[in-house]
Amino acid sequence: MEKNREIISKNNINVEVFLIRSLIGKLNKKVKVLKALGLNKIGDKKVHFLNQSIKGMLNETINMILLSEVSNV
């Protein structure tokens, strides 16, 4: 299984974002980024097309998420 940083370095792929850490006690900026990604509570999953704006959002919250590459969506 690839690590988060290896997946973020790729371009134009679909990634599944999985929230693995709680939002409680986190900086308000990080909470807003995660909610913009569609992740509200632990265990939420969303599929996003990996472009520059999504990469920035994922880099901001890299320690709270788990990424996996999705082939067909």
From Swiss-Prot:
Family statement drawn from the similarity comment of this UniProt entry: Belongs to the universal ribosomal protein uL30 family.
Q: How does it assemble?
A: Part of the 50S ribosomal subunit.
What organism does the record attribute this protein to?
Borreliella afzelii (strain PKo) (Borrelia afzelii)
Disulfide-bonded cysteines = none
Question: Example GO biological process term?
Answer: translation
Which Gene Ontology CC terms are recorded? large ribosomal subunit
- Tell me the protein's name: Large ribosomal subunit protein uL30
Q: What would be the name of the gene that encodes this protein?
A: rpmD
- Report the superkingdom from the record: Bacteria
Q: What HAMAP family does the database record attribute to this sequence?
A: Ribosomal_uL30_B
Task: Quote one Gene Ontology molecular function term.
Answer: structural constituent of ribosome
InterPro entries reported for this sequence: Ribo_uL30_ferredoxin-like_sf, Ribosomal_uL30_bac-type, Ribosomal_uL30_ferredoxin-like
Q: Which UniProt keywords apply?
A: Ribonucleoprotein, Ribosomal protein
Q: Which residues form a coiled coil?
A: none
Q: What is the lineage of its organism?
A: Bacteria, Pseudomonadati, Spirochaetota, Spirochaetia, Spirochaetales
Check the record and name the Pfam families matching this protein.
Ribosomal_L30
